[in-house]
């Protein structure tokens, strides 16, 4: 259980310290909650922060659960940086079904990314098994067997606003 996204991001960034100093590397976050985590990782590692706009299609009656996902090309917060031949640390505040992250990974591979490290605070074991063959490295702090929604693993899990995302990306 994490206190909030800040605590989760700090814990995750400590597991990524070996990436500090890697050239041609970028942290990419899934907006909006993932940007809080991504900002901490990027600042800790001295890497640029960008976003990959994979959006979930919510399950009716369970908005935190993805029925599917797609790449949003509206570029609300700016475009996804060039990832060709780069090392990417892909992050979010957690993974439930894996649909959103899987969509992001496929998008990055089409853009000829160099290597992908998927780093998230929490994801269910069955989803981790499904995703591990899609990335070069997987760093997940908690992999519970019983999983309802990402928010269950945070004491404080408010919605992140567009304004907060813009501020994190600007600073």
Placement of each model-derived feature along the sequence:
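PRPP-associated nucleotide enzymes
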Residues: 1-171
